[in-house]
Amino acid sequence: PAFGEVNQLGGVFVNGRPLPNAIRLRIVELAQLGIRPCDISRQLRVSHGCVSKILARYNETGSILPGAIGGSKPRVTTPTVVKHIRTYKQRDPGIFAWEIRDRLLADGVCDKYNVPSVSSISRILRNKIGNLSQQGHYESYKQHQPPPQPPLPYNHIYSYPSPIAAAGAKVPTPPGVPAIPGTMAMPRTWPSSHSVTDILGIRSITDQVSDTSSYPSPKVEEWSSLGRSSFPPAAQHAVNGLEKSSLEQEAKYSQAHNGLPAVGSFVSAPAMSPYATSAQVSPYMPYSAAPSSYMAGHGWQHTAGTPLSPHGCDLPASLAFKGVQTAREGSHSVTASAL
């Protein structure tokens, strides 16, 4: 031929291509005549390795044709095997590939010659059965999944949880708008959709517990609608050894207007200074009226004590300790009589 290479014996061959069938047949015929392989190699100008390989294959298979001996391995992942593997996986989702291989042999589905390898079983589980099992888990998850919650209502700043919005009784009030008193106020806690209570769903439980409590507390928005007079005094102070009752607190906060903006939602009432009015009247200024016409006859005054007049009126020297409710009743009566 016009192309090829020359070996050490002077013969021509093409690298990577099989020896022609005519030369192969001639090698077999000379071998059957009893000629040694080395002599056949010199006579036909074919390498000794090629002659030996052709003769060995002929003695083994009886064929002189080139190609792989025996062909490829027969297919072991038949539909029957895949079906049994799927059954094993559905019965025991945590089964291993080597356990499936042993069970295929134990159940007689395969024998030791055609049983799939562990890697083949893993590939079947990953490609053919994995999607089916995931789809089955998804379908079962959808069946056991509760109905979806309604979308969260959106406010201009914060989004509120759906249990509060679904109640319909607690509507958030944006800043600058007069607060809605009563049951239309928002919850006591500042709403935030990223808090732990909202994520875990504890807010509705805490609201129910606090709503059924025996000590009702005013809501955040209700604070701004309530008058300053409704707050009890923060602390009881003593002036000249006497107990200063909530009368001073009443005198301070009774001058404040009730229609103030919703500042009380964020600042506690006792921490705020009294608002300026047109005429500042000190609760300590002396009165021109006679003591007998001003404070005589009230039930809380201790008549047995020695009266002192630091403010131009009769006050007892010592007062017995009373509860907050008694002090508030007395302060209301004094305020009414003073007005």
UniProtKB/Swiss-Prot annotation:
Keywords: Developmental protein, DNA-binding, Nucleus, Paired box, Transcription, Transcription regulation. Gene3D superfamilies: Winged helix-like DNA-binding domain superfamily/Winged helix DNA-binding domain. The keyword NADP does not apply. One of its GO terms (molecular function) is RNA polymerase II cis-regulatory region sequence-specific DNA binding. Residues 80-128 are annotated as: RED subdomain. Residues 5-61 are annotated as: PAI subdomain. GO terms for cellular component: nucleus. InterPro entries: Homeodomain-like_sf (IPR009057), PAIRED_DNA-bd_dom (IPR043182), Paired_dom (IPR001523), PAX_fam (IPR043565), WH-like_DNA-bd_sf (IPR036388). Residues 2-128 bind DNA. It is found in: Nucleus. Coiled coil: none annotated. GO terms for biological process: regulation of transcription by RNA polymerase II. This is Paired box protein Pax-9.
